[in-house]
Amino acid sequence: MAYAKTDLFDSKLKSAAVLFKALAHPARLAILKYLAETKVCITGDISDELPLSRTTVNQHLTELKNAGLIQGHVDGIKVNYCLDPVKVCELGKVFQELYDLINRSANYNCK
């Protein structure tokens, strides 16, 4: 029976990998930063805020939405985008757990 190599890892690691993959492009980080700074759901074209085409921005929005980091709600012909607070908290916990583990085991004592 065939299986994917990712099947060898537990679900917590696989979930973390999905989040990290979504963060692995500067455009997606810029989109998250923009949504966080505006603190409201954005109606309209986020591509006006980035040096990328509308099509490229939409592809990155899709990646972020598939990872659950943002929500997109259709309102007529526009989509309202905002951060997903539950997933953002989950992301923070994943980062904190990984940071604590690395810092503790390597004795870096980062401050």
Feature-to-residue mapping (PLM):
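Regular, well-ordered alpha-helical segments
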Residues: A22, N66, E97-D100
